[in-house]
Amino acid sequence: MARSTCRRTNVIVPEEGKVMKKIAVLFPGIGYHADKPLLYYSKKLVMNKGYKIADVKYGVLPSGVKGNPEKMLEAFKLALKYATKQLQEIDFRSYDEILFISKSVGTAVAAAFADENHINARHIYFTPVPESFAYIKQPGIVFHGTADPWADTELIKTECRKRNLPLYITENANHSMETGDVVNDLLIMKGIIENVSSFL
């Protein structure tokens, strides 16, 4: 897995004796839910590191969004509406550290939600779609596979460079960060979670 240097940003050092209050919010993709590997293992990792978890669940979203900008925008707006409704009771100001973990279209939802609600979050962006970069402004790390049919690798590289986002590229991995070789996919997942752990 190719990678660039990962830098820690916006990390708050607690006063001596104070336990940091941390929350992680999971923003899934349209068909990639929190029980699938990238989000499942990320969730377990951050739980072990003391984060409270909030799982966003979307309602019905449009199908056939791939390659259809209008449907993609419609899906994004609906997903953002669902997320906003579910997260409105959380007082993010009460947390010392806020982490948004997102997948695919969820990367746009997470970025837009943070921006609209003035939430200072760090992000883990799994396989963002090109449209996501219109909303991505905050620091984080990005994961992308070169066989992802939803996003061109050169475009992802360019957009990450513009925003100074560390980008982890896996050769021949698809939109789920898998290659079809089960043993290799397990090794890929291990590397991804290790990189996520280093970012935290």
Where are these regions (language model features)?
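Gly/Ala-rich beta-loop-alpha elbow adjacent to hydrolase catalytic centers
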Residues: 101-110
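Serine-hydrolase catalytic machinery in alpha/beta-hydrolase-like enzymes
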Residues: 21-94
